[in-house]
Amino acid sequence: MTISFQDGRYAARLARTDADLIACQRLRHQCFFGGAGQDRDAYDPICGHVMVEDQAGRLVATARLLEIASGAEIGKCYAAGCYDLSGLATCDAPMIEVGRFCIAADARDADVLRVAWGAFTGLVDARGIAFLFGCTSFAGTDPVPYGQAFQRLAARHLGPDTLRPRPKAAEVVRFADIPPEGAIPMPPLLRTYLAMGGWVCDHAVIDRHMQTLHVFTCLEVASVPPARAAALRALAQTASLP
Protein backbone atom coordinates (compact mmCIF):
# COMPACT_ATOMS: atom_id res chain seq x y z
CA MET A 1 0.00 0.00 0.00
CA THR A 2 1.61 3.24 -1.16
CA ILE A 3 0.33 6.76 -1.53
CA SER A 4 1.74 10.12 -2.52
CA PHE A 5 -0.39 13.25 -2.65
CA GLN A 6 0.42 16.95 -2.74
CA ASP A 7 -1.82 20.01 -2.70
CA GLY A 8 -0.45 23.49 -2.17
CA ARG A 9 1.13 23.88 1.24
CA TYR A 10 0.79 20.25 2.36
CA ALA A 11 1.69 16.81 1.06
CA ALA A 12 0.49 13.37 2.15
CA ARG A 13 2.38 10.11 1.91
CA LEU A 14 2.72 6.82 3.71
CA ALA A 15 5.46 6.21 6.26
CA ARG A 16 8.34 4.36 4.61
CA THR A 17 10.99 4.00 7.30
CA ASP A 18 11.32 3.31 11.00
CA ALA A 19 12.09 7.00 11.47
CA ASP A 20 8.82 7.91 9.74
CA LEU A 21 6.86 5.62 12.06
CA ILE A 22 8.59 7.04 15.13
CA ALA A 23 7.67 10.55 13.98
CA CYS A 24 4.02 9.48 13.70
CA GLN A 25 4.10 7.91 17.14
CA ARG A 26 5.63 11.04 18.64
CA LEU A 27 2.99 13.29 17.12
CA ARG A 28 0.28 10.94 18.38
CA HIS A 29 1.72 11.07 21.89
CA GLN A 30 1.90 14.85 21.78
CA CYS A 31 -1.72 15.14 20.60
CA PHE A 32 -3.31 12.47 22.78
CA PHE A 33 -1.21 12.58 25.95
CA GLY A 34 0.81 15.80 25.77
CA GLY A 35 4.56 16.22 25.95
CA ALA A 36 7.35 14.08 24.56
CA GLY A 37 7.03 10.33 24.08
CA GLN A 38 5.81 7.67 21.67
CA ASP A 39 2.27 6.34 21.43
CA ARG A 40 2.69 2.81 20.11
CA ASP A 41 0.84 -0.47 20.31
CA ALA A 42 0.51 -3.88 18.67
CA TYR A 43 -1.54 -2.50 15.76
CA ASP A 44 1.22 -0.27 14.40
CA PRO A 45 3.18 -3.03 12.60
CA ILE A 46 0.12 -4.23 10.63
CA CYS A 47 -1.06 -0.77 9.53
CA GLY A 48 -0.08 1.82 6.96
CA HIS A 49 0.64 5.24 8.44
CA VAL A 50 -0.41 8.38 6.57
CA MET A 51 1.81 11.42 7.07
CA VAL A 52 0.72 14.95 6.17
CA GLU A 53 3.71 17.29 6.01
CA ASP A 54 4.08 21.00 5.40
CA GLN A 55 6.43 22.57 2.85
CA ALA A 56 9.30 22.40 5.33
CA GLY A 57 8.82 18.65 5.74
CA ARG A 58 7.36 18.97 9.25
CA LEU A 59 4.79 16.35 10.18
CA VAL A 60 1.50 18.10 10.93
CA ALA A 61 -0.97 15.20 10.89
CA THR A 62 -1.03 11.44 10.89
CA ALA A 63 -3.48 8.55 10.75
CA ARG A 64 -3.04 4.82 10.57
CA LEU A 65 -4.93 2.62 8.14
CA LEU A 66 -5.73 -1.06 8.55
CA GLU A 67 -6.98 -2.64 5.34
CA ILE A 68 -9.10 -5.79 5.63
CA ALA A 69 -10.42 -7.91 2.78
CA SER A 70 -13.94 -8.28 4.16
CA GLY A 71 -16.01 -8.21 7.32
CA ALA A 72 -14.83 -11.74 8.08
CA GLU A 73 -11.50 -10.17 9.16
CA ILE A 74 -12.99 -7.36 11.22
CA GLY A 75 -12.07 -9.04 14.48
CA LYS A 76 -8.43 -8.03 14.03
CA CYS A 77 -9.13 -4.29 13.98
CA TYR A 78 -8.69 -1.91 16.93
CA ALA A 79 -12.40 -1.09 17.16
CA ALA A 80 -13.27 -4.76 17.66
CA GLY A 81 -11.77 -4.55 21.14
CA CYS A 82 -14.32 -1.90 22.13
CA TYR A 83 -17.44 -2.63 20.07
CA ASP A 84 -19.44 -5.69 19.05
CA LEU A 85 -18.98 -5.56 15.26
CA SER A 86 -20.94 -8.69 14.39
CA GLY A 87 -23.19 -6.71 12.03
CA LEU A 88 -20.30 -5.50 9.89
CA ALA A 89 -18.71 -8.95 10.05
CA THR A 90 -21.38 -10.18 7.64
CA CYS A 91 -20.36 -7.70 4.91
CA ASP A 92 -18.40 -9.30 2.08
CA ALA A 93 -16.57 -6.15 1.00
CA PRO A 94 -13.12 -4.60 1.54
CA MET A 95 -12.80 -2.10 4.38
CA ILE A 96 -10.28 0.29 5.91
CA GLU A 97 -10.12 1.18 9.59
CA VAL A 98 -8.86 4.74 10.13
CA GLY A 99 -7.28 5.14 13.55
CA ARG A 100 -5.16 7.47 15.66
CA PHE A 101 -5.99 10.44 13.43
CA CYS A 102 -4.49 13.59 14.92
CA ILE A 103 -3.35 17.06 13.86
CA ALA A 104 -0.61 19.09 15.54
CA ALA A 105 -2.01 21.79 17.81
CA ASP A 106 -0.29 24.55 15.84
CA ALA A 107 -1.52 23.25 12.47
CA ARG A 108 -5.29 23.38 12.87
CA ASP A 109 -5.77 24.36 9.24
CA ALA A 110 -8.78 23.06 7.30
CA ASP A 111 -6.45 22.26 4.41
CA VAL A 112 -4.63 19.68 6.53
CA LEU A 113 -7.83 17.67 6.98
CA ARG A 114 -8.71 18.22 3.32
CA VAL A 115 -5.37 16.86 2.11
CA ALA A 116 -5.71 13.83 4.38
CA TRP A 117 -9.15 13.07 2.94
CA GLY A 118 -7.81 13.53 -0.57
CA ALA A 119 -5.21 10.88 0.19
CA PHE A 120 -7.82 8.55 1.71
CA THR A 121 -10.01 8.98 -1.38
CA GLY A 122 -7.25 7.98 -3.76
CA LEU A 123 -6.62 4.84 -1.75
CA VAL A 124 -10.33 4.00 -1.47
CA ASP A 125 -10.77 4.20 -5.25
CA ALA A 126 -7.60 2.27 -6.02
CA ARG A 127 -8.50 -0.57 -3.65
CA GLY A 128 -12.25 -0.69 -4.25
CA ILE A 129 -12.94 -0.03 -0.57
CA ALA A 130 -16.62 -0.18 0.44
CA PHE A 131 -16.42 0.96 4.07
CA LEU A 132 -14.23 3.39 6.03
CA PHE A 133 -14.65 3.16 9.79
CA GLY A 134 -12.96 4.01 13.04
CA CYS A 135 -13.31 5.48 16.52
CA THR A 136 -13.74 9.27 16.53
CA SER A 137 -12.58 10.87 19.76
CA PHE A 138 -13.97 13.54 22.07
CA ALA A 139 -11.45 15.02 24.52
CA GLY A 140 -11.92 13.97 28.15
CA THR A 141 -13.99 11.23 29.74
CA ASP A 142 -17.02 13.25 30.88
CA PRO A 143 -19.87 13.03 28.34
CA VAL A 144 -21.97 15.84 29.83
CA PRO A 145 -20.14 18.75 28.11
CA TYR A 146 -20.99 17.10 24.77
CA GLY A 147 -24.65 16.51 25.56
CA GLN A 148 -26.07 18.45 22.62
CA ALA A 149 -23.67 16.81 20.18
CA PHE A 150 -24.54 13.33 21.39
CA GLN A 151 -28.27 14.05 21.26
CA ARG A 152 -27.87 15.27 17.68
CA LEU A 153 -26.03 12.07 16.78
CA ALA A 154 -28.83 10.02 18.31
CA ALA A 155 -31.53 11.95 16.47
CA ARG A 156 -29.94 12.23 13.02
CA HIS A 157 -26.97 9.98 12.47
CA LEU A 158 -27.49 6.48 13.88
CA GLY A 159 -26.45 3.68 11.57
CA PRO A 160 -28.66 0.88 10.25
CA ASP A 161 -29.78 -1.50 12.95
CA THR A 162 -28.34 -4.46 11.03
CA LEU A 163 -24.85 -2.94 10.93
CA ARG A 164 -24.67 -0.70 13.99
CA PRO A 165 -22.21 -1.96 16.64
CA ARG A 166 -23.49 -3.04 20.06
CA PRO A 167 -21.83 -2.22 23.39
CA LYS A 168 -18.83 -4.33 24.36
CA ALA A 169 -16.40 -2.14 26.33
CA ALA A 170 -16.35 -2.09 30.13
CA GLU A 171 -17.42 1.57 30.31
CA VAL A 172 -20.00 2.92 27.89
CA VAL A 173 -22.57 5.70 28.00
CA ARG A 174 -25.61 5.66 25.75
CA PHE A 175 -26.48 8.87 23.97
CA ALA A 176 -30.04 8.63 25.26
CA ASP A 177 -28.77 8.84 28.85
CA ILE A 178 -26.77 12.07 28.38
CA PRO A 179 -28.68 15.29 29.19
CA PRO A 180 -28.77 17.71 26.21
CA GLU A 181 -27.04 20.51 28.09
CA GLY A 182 -23.34 20.67 27.21
CA ALA A 183 -22.66 22.65 24.05
CA ILE A 184 -19.09 21.68 23.09
CA PRO A 185 -19.27 20.91 19.34
CA MET A 186 -18.39 17.69 17.59
CA PRO A 187 -14.74 17.20 16.60
CA PRO A 188 -13.86 18.15 12.99
CA LEU A 189 -13.11 14.57 11.91
CA LEU A 190 -16.57 13.41 12.98
CA ARG A 191 -18.23 16.37 11.26
CA THR A 192 -16.43 15.43 8.05
CA TYR A 193 -17.62 11.82 8.25
CA LEU A 194 -21.20 12.98 8.80
CA ALA A 195 -21.08 15.50 5.95
CA MET A 196 -20.24 12.62 3.63
CA GLY A 197 -23.14 10.50 4.85
CA GLY A 198 -21.41 8.64 7.66
CA TRP A 199 -23.22 7.13 10.62
CA VAL A 200 -22.46 6.25 14.24
CA CYS A 201 -23.40 3.74 16.91
CA ASP A 202 -25.73 4.70 19.78
CA HIS A 203 -23.17 5.05 22.56
CA ALA A 204 -19.75 6.38 23.49
CA VAL A 205 -16.92 4.35 24.98
CA ILE A 206 -14.99 5.83 27.91
CA ASP A 207 -11.30 5.20 27.26
CA ARG A 208 -9.35 5.81 30.48
CA HIS A 209 -5.98 5.09 28.88
CA MET A 210 -6.43 7.68 26.14
CA GLN A 211 -8.49 9.97 28.40
CA THR A 212 -11.13 10.30 25.71
CA LEU A 213 -14.64 9.34 24.81
CA HIS A 214 -14.88 7.69 21.43
CA VAL A 215 -17.72 6.81 19.11
CA PHE A 216 -17.72 4.17 16.39
CA THR A 217 -18.12 5.94 13.06
CA CYS A 218 -18.64 4.36 9.65
CA LEU A 219 -18.80 5.69 6.11
CA GLU A 220 -20.31 3.54 3.38
CA VAL A 221 -18.47 4.76 0.29
CA ALA A 222 -21.46 4.17 -1.99
CA SER A 223 -23.57 6.55 0.13
CA VAL A 224 -21.28 9.59 -0.28
CA PRO A 225 -23.29 12.34 -2.05
CA PRO A 226 -22.26 12.51 -5.74
CA ALA A 227 -21.13 16.14 -5.58
CA ARG A 228 -19.00 15.45 -2.52
CA ALA A 229 -17.52 12.32 -4.11
CA ALA A 230 -16.66 14.25 -7.28
CA ALA A 231 -14.92 16.97 -5.27
CA LEU A 232 -12.87 14.42 -3.33
CA ARG A 233 -11.87 12.59 -6.50
CA ALA A 234 -10.83 15.86 -8.10
CA LEU A 235 -8.71 16.56 -5.03
CA ALA A 236 -7.17 13.10 -5.21
CA GLN A 237 -6.48 13.03 -8.94
CA THR A 238 -2.75 13.63 -8.44
CA ALA A 239 -2.43 10.73 -6.01
CA SER A 240 -0.04 7.96 -7.08
CA LEU A 241 -1.24 4.54 -6.01
CA PRO A 242 -0.52 0.91 -6.92
Where do the model's predicted regions map?
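Short, cationic low-complexity segments
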Residues: A126, L235-P242
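Long, contiguous binding/interaction regions
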Residues: S223-P225, A229-A231
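C-terminal "cap" of GNAT-fold acetyltransferases
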Residues: Q211-V224
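Acyl-donor binding region in acyl/amide transferases
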Residues: I68-W199, A204-T212
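Short, flexible loop/turn elements at secondary-structure junctions
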Residues: R16, D54, E67-A69, R100-C102, ...
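Short amphipathic alpha-helix that is part of the acyltransferase structural core
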Residues: T2-V60
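Conserved GNAT-family N-acetyltransferase fold
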Residues: V50, A63, F101
